[in-house]
Amino acid sequence: MSKIIELKNVNKWFDKFQALKDVNLEVNQQEKIVICGPSGSGKSTLIRCINRLEEHQEGHIVVDGNEISEKTKDIEKIRAEVGMVFQQFNLFPHLSILDNCTLAPIWVKKLTKKQAEEIAMENLKRVQIDDQALKFPGQLSGGQQQRAALARALCMEPKIMLF
């Protein structure tokens, strides 16, 4: 099986604080892994570096055969293949859950509204909140918001999912 994510000696500092120290990791296609650790141990920093939302200072990160660095030219194309659910769910409060899930597929993937809504409803059903599709984020519990954020990421049909 081929590698979809590869990290070699990845280091990241915030001023004098080293958030990531010599991280080495290989993830194969279709493989599911869990990175666990206490608060402040660098888990979120690591996934933000994989998606180039944070810059790593040393080492190599390769995602689906593309090295991720300041020289990466088509980072948006790579990001379109990497779904991400943030600690703060970042749902748009003024949009329904359904609209939160259809926005990126319509704008980025150029799907029709009908196509995007069908995919969104499939994914909302997958995370068991399809009955909440017309509600707004503030009307859902924290757990439901997390599932809505996961469904939203799945609507882009990513090769890789980080959360």
Residue ranges and their predicted role:
Residues 3-163:
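ABC family nucleotide-binding domain
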